[in-house]
Each structure stands twice: as C-alpha cells, then as structure tokens.
Amino acid sequence: MHSCSHTHFVSFKLPHFFAPKSFVVSSRRELRVFAVATTVEEASGNIPAAPISLPQGSWKQIAGGVTAAKGFKAAGMYAGLRAAGKKPDLALVTCDVEAVAAGVFTTNVVAAAPVVYCKKVLETSKTARAVLINAGQANAATGDAGYQDMLDCVGSIATLLKVKPEEVLIESTGVIGQRIKKEELLHALPTLVNSRSDSVEEADSAAVAITTTDLVSKSVAVESQVGGIKIRVGGMAKGSGMIHPNMATMLGVITTDALVESDIWRKMVKVAVNRSFNQITVDGDTSTNDTVIALASGLSGSPSISSLNCKEAAQLQACLDAVMQGLAKSIAWDGEGATCLIEVTVKGTETEAEAAKIARSVASSSLVKAAVYGRDPNWGRIAAAAGYAGVSFQMDKLKISLGEFSLMESGQPLPFDRDGASNYLKKTGEVHGTVTIDISVGDGAAIGKAWGCDLSYDYVKINAEYTS
C-alpha cells in the first residue's frame, strides 16, 4: 500500500451492475468506472468494480482481482507513458514463488516485441515470477531497437525483484509503431516494485493502468474448491476496441493458487481462452499485441492436477472459464461507442466448436451489430450470419429468438410483435444491458456462446480521433 500522503488511483463502484441474467447500469455510457487521484484515506471503501457477469457455478465472486489468490502482489502507477493525463499507465503483477506459467498470444503475423519475447521465453521455461504491463506504446513494428528497449526493461525489473530475466514476462498496449518510453519506464520501476501489495486497491490500480480507450477497468476473482480445498482464481484484462478473434487488442493476466502441472495448465488456459476471449468481437480487427498470461502459484494446498481427466481438473477448469468469460463479456460490454452487450447462444450442433463458430459469426456481423444499434429486429441478418459461418446445418432446423421474441421457426419467419422487439432493443440500449440472441440449428447436444456489442456512430468518431 502507498502511504496515506501519496497519490493513489482507485475505481468507483457503480450501483446496480447485476441483474438475474445480465448486468446493467442506470445511465448508459456516462456512468462508468473511472480513475481518480485521491489519498488512500479518501479512497477508503471504494473497491474495483466493472460490469462483470459470471456464468452460473459453484464458485462465489470475491474481491481482489489478480491479488485474490495466495502468493500474488500487484501495483499500478502513473509513469508518464501516456500522451496525456495522470491515469496509471504501468502495472506489475508478481508471485512470491515460481508460478507455473501459460500464455496465449495474437495470431497477427505483425506481432509486437513483447509477444515475440514472451512466446520465446515460454517455449523453454515452465515458470515465471512477474508480469510487467505498460500502456501508451504498443512497441509493435519497432524493429531491433524496440526489442532491445523491452529487454532493457525486463533486465531492470528482474534486478529489482531479484529474479532471473527469463522469469519476467511483459505486455504492452498503445499506439502501434511507437517504442516504449524507456527512460520514463525505467525511472518508475523502483517505485512500482516498492508499491506492490496483495491489497484490493493495488489490484485495482494495476487493472486501471493497463487500459487505453477502455471506459472501465476489468477485474474479477472467484473462490471455489478443488479436491475439497479452497482455491482462488482471479484476473484483470483490458480491451475496448480492435477486439476480434483471435483475441484482439486484449491484454489479460490470470492468477490462481491451485496446484497444477505445466502441460495441463497450458491446455486448460487454451481451452478457457477459446471459450471466452476468442469468442468476443467489437470491430473485426485483430491486434498486434494480444496476450493472456496465466500464473499458478500452487500455494492453496489443493491436490496437484496432473491429468485433464480428473474431477479436480474439471473443478479448476470451471473456475478458469468463469473468470475469463466474465472478463471477456466485460470487454465486449465496454466496446467503443457501444450501447449494449450482445450475447449469442447457439444450440443443436454436434460439437462445441461448431456451435461456437456460428455464434462468433453472428456476433461479428457488422450488419447484425448495426441493426441492434438501430433497434431493428432484423432476423434476416442473423440468419445470414449463421448461414455463412462455415458450419453445415439443415435450413428447416433453424430457430431464432431475440430476447423473448421468437423470430424464426423451422427455417421460416414467424409473425411477431415488431414494435415490441424494437422496444426491447431500445430499452436494453438505454440501460446498457444485454441483448440476447438464441439460435438452434439442429438436434445435437452441443452449445456455444459468443459476445459482441452494437455498432454505433460513436465507434467511428472514437477511432477517427485516436492518435496515430
């Protein structure tokens, strides 16, 4: 914790985020979590809050984000990396022990320096001790000089933490083509290291520090049991624009105190990413910097997980899925210029992958997204997007519902209350709620979900004005 005389950054908790099946806020985009400078005394009682909607499960949501699990500390601070303002722009997450590490990265061939570095490190190392994240400069397309800047930062933070350089992973977000402001970053590192704690406040500061065009910070943690022992899984993420499978301008750090072997952990993280971050879309752009780093300290005392085919693995996978899906939905909800979250559920396929592919196609459709923003219950656009997903299904099995309104049955349009359906879209947008689209394509048992947001005039304005 900072001393009470120091500037501290917190996020205000907005009321009424949660509803039985979706989350809402009471006044659209004006009421959001935002960073403010205050003292710790003044900040008392303000905890990190983002509109996180978790799936149903045996876990309970708790405070703490990345510091909820045993062995983890975090910090966030302003280091002068952003173009303007005093919002935190440098974050650090550390583990007291060697944490089993996994990473999932962008599929963009124009990969940023930190992506190249992390992939290389994790090819030979099973563990990590720290993740350093900067906002402001993406350090993508910066050549050898940008890569060396990053190595210098890694070396400096490793020295301060008294760990090996290869135990430090790094993530960057910001303007493509700009190198890290190395001098400012290096100057800030001693303060950042000394600011670390396992407090909720520092977890929140870190979550704020990694944001760019985000209007809310995203942080969540859950508590459950693995093998009868209490474990925790927490995480933070950033993302608002350039969000499209596979992953997007999306950074994430996931932590757990469960004990799990390296190869199993990496497979579990990949599965969870495929069910969450790879199932969200805002604008169809895939970033150069996508990174999710997941660390497992093993300090909970839970049984070691050495196989995917055991009850303990299923218990941990469920918690991991829940945290990542909660963060992913929050990112889509916070899509640039958006007025609502769109949740697409597809049933009736033979495999989960097929259902997920159709759901992703519908959630990604610019025409569907524009129709939702225009409050137009356009079943034709939904049907078309499902049809071009690349998954074969029988037309006469197709069913489509929008909220409580059935739009299509047996591949044929149904008479429905168009004004009522339009009003459903309007009212959902007014409270920045969740529009649900349910699709059935057959008799299979598989289910897949995807999340997106509507496409508004403001999206164009925000990105037209974003600096290059």
UniProtKB/Swiss-Prot annotation:
It is an enzyme of class 2 (transferase). The record marks 248-249 as: Cleavage. Substrate binds at residues 212, 238, 249, 336, 463, 468. Pathway: Amino-acid biosynthesis; L-arginine biosynthesis; L-ornithine and N-acetyl-L-glutamate from L-glutamate and N(2)-acetyl-L-ornithine (cyclic): step 1/1; Amino-acid biosynthesis; L-arginine biosynthesis; N(2)-acetyl-L-ornithine from L-glutamate: step 1/4. It catalyses: N(2)-acetyl-L-ornithine + L-glutamate = N-acetyl-L-glutamate + L-ornithine; L-glutamate + acetyl-CoA = N-acetyl-L-glutamate + CoA + H(+). GO terms for biological process: L-arginine biosynthetic process. Gene3D superfamilies: ArgJ beta chain, C-terminal domain, L-amino peptidase D-ALA esterase/amidase. It comes from the Eukaryota. Its EC number is 2.3.1.35, 2.3.1.1. PANTHER family: ARGININE BIOSYNTHESIS BIFUNCTIONAL PROTEIN ARGJ, ARGININE BIOSYNTHESIS BIFUNCTIONAL PROTEIN ARGJ, MITOCHONDRIAL. This is Arginine biosynthesis bifunctional protein ArgJ, chloroplastic. It comes from Arabidopsis thaliana. The lineage of its organism: Eukaryota, Viridiplantae, Streptophyta, Embryophyta, Tracheophyta.
